[in-house]
Amino acid sequence: MSAQEFYQGGNQRGYQQQQFPPPPGGPPQDQNGGKQEYVPPQGQPPNYNMKPSQPYASTNPETGGQPVYQDTAPFSQANEKTGERMNPRKRVNDIIPLILFIAAVVGFAVVSGIAIHGFVQVNGLGGGMGDSSIGRTGSSITLDYHTVYLLLVVVALGLVIASLYLAALRAFTKIILEVTLALTVILNIGICIYYFIIQYWSGAIIFLIIALVSVFFYWGMRKRIPLAKLLLQTTIDVTKHHPSVYVVVFIGLIIQAAVSVWYTFTCIAIYVKWTPGSAACSDGGCSSSKVAGLVFYATFSYLWLSQVIGNVILCTLAGGVFGGWYYYGPRTPGGGVPKRASLLAFVRASTLSLGSIAFGSLLVTILELLRLILQLFRQYEAGQGDMIGSILICIAQCCIGCIQWMVEYFNKYAYIEIALYGKSYIPAAKDTWRLLKDRGIDALVNDSLVGTALMWGAYINGFLCAVLGYFYLRFTHPAYNSDGQYSAPVILFSFLIGLNESFTVGSAIDAGVSTIFVGLGEDPMVLAERSPGLFEMIRQVYPRVVQGVPH
């Protein structure tokens, strides 16, 4: 089920491929293969009613001479995309992965319930929990009002700093992109020099390679800043008009945190419940192998569930506000982004497309599990003094880590295809492969520039929150920190709060930039018809946009 069908009940908006007539007095159309060369309009250029600093764009530009773009073979198969490809059947995709995912989550919940129930019954081995008839032998830690105030102030400061950084990024996009790119290169060189000074040779060699690569690519990436700047400005403007995207990502963050806490307690409870000799092991069915197997299963289910949650959020953003803006334009009394776009996209992502999301997430989960298993083997070999075996396993870990990164990057665009066009995972992966073959370098550089700018904003936010935590402890002198023993944990926790808040806000921006990039590759003429002024600005900094992705 496509975004258009889902939002409009199957009514098409008329985004069929058009042959733009040449402007009056312009050269005749080239009939060779139906192609025409770009010819600027004659006379006074049309007024698109759009300022360059506001790429959010109006959906109703004044009529006038239309720019003529080169019609390649044809615009990313526009007829196909506005036909059957944009209207897949309304059905649940990838049913088998969906069933496996549901079974894994239900099994995890059952194991967790049994384990935590046994854990609570024996007071958590002195952890202060359980039936009062048995006795609460554990000690508890109570947060006083100083800690509560600190957490509230740090959270508020983190949100304010994240908002201010986005405002600065919107106002000074090009400057911040250039500065953060240069800072990344300088940081890599600095870490490399530091490791050489302290004679940490393995780390020094790794960062020497990273520094050389970053210096080599620096100049090439600078040339692509104009496109990243325009897409970033457009995305920030979209989110300014639709702040619900931030609500979506923060809800996702809260759910992820809750699932992580659930997994942590489950693993602890599994050890308590089934470890031989434990007070909770009363039925004689305990063994170390059972503990290992259940922890492995819990870890697998947790990683898969965590991946699915994050990818459902991505599909909600891509198929909701950002996809709705690209295909329908800004919200107006007569149309634009559909109402409750995020809610509708979430419903589709968590029902019809959940199997496709689970399919892609399973691939990443398997790779992450392999990496964790290799980590355990490497620690074992190092403990046995087998350095050669440890080095070989470390190399294997690096290889699997690289493969995992590539699969995750590939999957991000596949999920956007799923969110926009309602595909199952395999067709989405095929179209993503075509997209990345044709625009892979452009997408990678664009994501790197945007990601670097957002990353430095997160570090700045985390640092300022940590400074606030330090000064708060210094001037309030809470009783629990009379000897300064909790200063480091509180400062670190403050840093992590600010860091995560910025990364959460940044994930919405990253999703928007990638969604618009996919739209420009798959259906460039949609934006050309809806907002020719914005499309012309993009064409000036990225001429390939008029070609579309061949299929």
Swiss-Prot record:
Extracellular-side segments: 116-147, 199-200, 266-307, 378-386, 474-488
Region of interest (Disordered), residue spans: 1-72
Recorded GO CC terms: membrane; plasma membrane
Subcellular location per the Swiss-Prot or TrEMBL entry: Cell membrane
Cytoplasmic side, ranges: 1-94, 169-177, 222-244, 329-356, 408-452, 510-551
Membrane topology of this protein: Multi-pass membrane protein
Biased composition (Polar residues): 45-63
InterPro entries: Choline_transptr-like (IPR007603)
GO molecular function, one term: transmembrane transporter activity
Bias kind Low complexity: ranges: 8-19
GO BP term, example: transmembrane transport
Residues that span the membrane, as ranges: 95-115, 148-168, 178-198, 201-221, 245-265, 308-328, 357-377, 387-407, 453-473, 489-509
Keyword field: Cell membrane, Membrane, Transmembrane, Transmembrane helix, Transport
Protein family per UniProt: Belongs to the CTL (choline transporter-like) family.
Protein function: Probably involved in transport through the plasma membrane.
Name of the protein described by the UniProt record: Protein PNS1
Species per Swiss-Prot/TrEMBL record: Cryptococcus neoformans var. neoformans serotype D (strain JEC21 / ATCC MYA-565) (Filobasidiella neoformans)
Source organism phylogeny: Eukaryota, Fungi, Dikarya, Basidiomycota, Agaricomycotina
